[in-house]
Amino acid sequence: MMEELRQTLDLQLSQLNTIAGILRAEQQLLCAGSIDINKLHEITEQKNFVLTALGHTDQKRQILSKQVGIDRPYQGQPFLADLWGQLVDLTEELKHLNQHNGLLLEQHITRNSETLHFLQKNHSPTLYGADGQAQRSILAGRKIQI
């Protein structure tokens, strides 16, 4: 059972490394001048899939740890403790990478919102109200006032 726990920790490490690759690909995409929304959606789906698998693997690790009678950081088992240390270090790295990607995404959203606001403000048709004054309409189509 100790070997199965080691294999589970190895699998978690592999899954975290996969997530690292996905986050780096996401970062490259977010650093590009314009975002390929289809590619971003694909990356998000990949990330969600691996995170779900990681959640299942962690549940298995917790069950095995209880069955063996040891828990993280596995100080009584040097090899397991080393694997756990690698997992903790990689998780911290992924946390920072994910936060950075979140900031990049937020910048894109802000820029797109500002652009949309500018376009709506400056490129909407001008209509005249009953008082003869110009009114801007941000709605598409015709506006009729009676």
UniProtKB/Swiss-Prot annotation:
Q: Write down the InterPro entries for this protein, in alphabetical order.
A: FlgN-like, FlgN-like_sf
Q: Which UniProt keywords apply?
A: Bacterial flagellum biogenesis, Cytoplasm
Task: Identify the SUPFAM superfamilies for this entry.
Answer: FlgN-like
- GO cellular component term, pick one: cytoplasm
Gene Ontology biological process: bacterial-type flagellum assembly
One Pfam family of this chain: FlgN
Q: Where in the cell is it found?
A: Cytoplasm
Q: Which family does it belong to?
A: Belongs to the FlgN family.
Summary of the function given for this chain in its UniProt record? Required for the efficient initiation of filament assembly.
Q: What is this protein called?
A: Flagella synthesis protein FlgN
Q: Which organism is it from?
A: Proteus mirabilis
Record gene name:
flgN
